[in-house]
A protein has these predicted regions:
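Bacterial N-terminal signal peptides
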Residues: 9-18
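Active-site- and interface-proximal helix/loop "cap" or "latch" segments in soluble metabolic
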Residues: 39-169, 175-413
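Intrinsically disordered, low-complexity tandem-repeat regions
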Residues: 29-30, 34, 39
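Sec-dependent signal peptide cleavage junction
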Residues: 18-31
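Bacterial N-terminal signal peptides that target proteins for export
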Residues: 1-8
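Non-catalytic cell-wall polysaccharide-engagement segments
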Residues: 2, 19, 355
Length: 413
């Protein structure tokens, strides 16, 4: 009997212990539903757990020490992103030969790229009639002759993630279009005195994207271009989505309008045809009618260490309604002076998947906090800094660089 009593007490204690753990577990109130739900003990990390990533890397290694600002002109809209007078495709001072890099002439490619892209996306693909078309066969033969792999391929491919330097000011228009089952195309257009002075496109794949690393991440400066460059599909197109976006932007700035017959690059036409082009044409009416109360003020400052800092502010009727700060790494690895940061070339601190993985998204947290405080205070330079992690060297550096940019544009609206 005594033995049975001991067993009873033992099992009773087993039941009480988990009940006590649950009782000590903090409760989380769902403000929308008004219900109280339990939060798993493991899901609530301690401060030491949150900061554990800091012990895995030396944060001092992620700072550009002794960097110097490039001397630039701070007159608004002084720099031109493209050369409108050139017969060549000149974007941000670099000449692009998309006839050569696309693997086929644009004229022929425009006839076939949509079908070929569908095939490589694993969808139904082109009809047999189209595949048998002599011009299609000709285009594919040209493409095969230009096929490159390995380092030769990387050397042949070139895309830029650099924004225009200096200050840009004008009326602001933005749009978003969901296409192809969850992909999101974004467009921002700035117009000053009837001139389109700036346009920037970006794309975000759905959260169900087959490559989970890129699911829900923007593509322009995240490192997605390298993911595409490793794909067999680009062995002959030699073009990334970033090339395709830049080419569309060049056409808009060259034509000075949004509604016209766009040309697309071989290998990046799906996003253009189904996302960006329809979006830009939808925005054309709004731009033509000057139907906006928003103003854009942006500034990009290059540094000699291979990083450019960028601040973009959106005003609506004089009130700050949005802000974004970013730091963009150089297009060429050798231009980045800090060895630790070289691997992030053609990416930015805000968008880079790998940079944010290594630094625990600390830069994104900084930018989100910065945006929140600026919107609350309605000042680019006068706001509380308690929530900003200035004890981290790379964040302290970013904050100081931000203040320099903010000081340059705080009186411009």
């Amino acid at each position: 009997m005594r033995k049975q009593s001991k067993f009873f007490i033992f099992f009773l204690l087993l039941g009480v212990f988990p009940l006590q753990v649950n009782a000590d577990t903090p409760a989380k109130v769902d403000a929308k539903a008004g219900a109280t739900t339990k939060v798993d003990v493991v899901s609530t990390p301690t401060v030491s757990q949150v900061d554990k990533w800091k012990t895995l890397i030396n944060l001092e290694d992620y700072v550009c020490n002794n960097k110097k600002r490039e001397k630039i002109n701070y007159t608004p809209n002084y720099y031109k992103y493209i050369d409108k007078n050139s017969n060549e495709i000149v974007i941000n001072g670099r000449v692009y030969d998309y006839d050569a890099s696309s693997g086929a002439s644009r004229t022929v490619a425009d006839m076939v790229n949509h079908s070929q892209t569908l095939k490589y996306d694993g969808k139904k693909g082109a009809s047999k009639e189209l595949e048998a078309d002599p011009k299609v066969k000709e285009a594919m033969e040209l493409a095969k002759k230009k096929t490159k792999k390995g380092q030769e391929k990387i050397n042949a491919m070139y895309w830029s993630v650099q924004p225009p330097k200096g200050i840009i000011v004008g009326d602001y228009y933005s749009g978003k279009k969901v296409f192809d089952g969850g992909y999101e195309a974004y467009a921002e257009v700035v117009v000053n005195n009837n001139e389109i002075v700036h346009i920037e496109l970006n794309e975000r794949p759905p959260v169900t994207y087959y490559a989970s690393e890129w699911a829900g991440e923007t593509k322009r400066r995240s490192g997605y271009g390298f993911f595409q460059a490793k794909s067999p599909r680009t062995d002959y197109t030699l073009a990334t989505l970033i090339n395709g976006m830049s080419y569309l932007e060049w056409q808009v700035l060259k034509n000075q309008k949004l509604d016209f017959d766009y040309k697309t690059l071989f290998g990046s036409s799906n996003s253009a045809r189904n996302g960006f082009v329809p979006l830009l044409k939808e925005m054309a009416k709004e731009v033509n009618e000057k139907a906006t109360d928003k103003r854009y003020v942006g500034i990009t400052q290059p540094y000699d260490c291979g990083i450019s800092t960028r601040l973009e502010v959106i005003y609506e009727k004089g009130k700050i309604v949005d802000l974004k700060y970013d730091e963009i790494f150089a297009d060429d690895k050798e231009d980045i002076k800090n060895p630790t940061l070289k691997e992030f070339y053609r990416q930015s601190k805000l968008e880079s998947v790998e940079y944010n993985r290594i630094t625990n998204k600390s830069f994104r947290t900084f930018v989100n906090t910065l945006r929140r405080e600026v919107l609350r205070s309605q000042s680019l330079t006068e706001f509380p800094t308690d929530a900003i992690k200035l004890d981290m060297p790379h964040i302290k550096e970013a904050y100081e660089d931000y203040l320099f940019l903010a000081g340059k544009i705080k009186n411009i609206k």
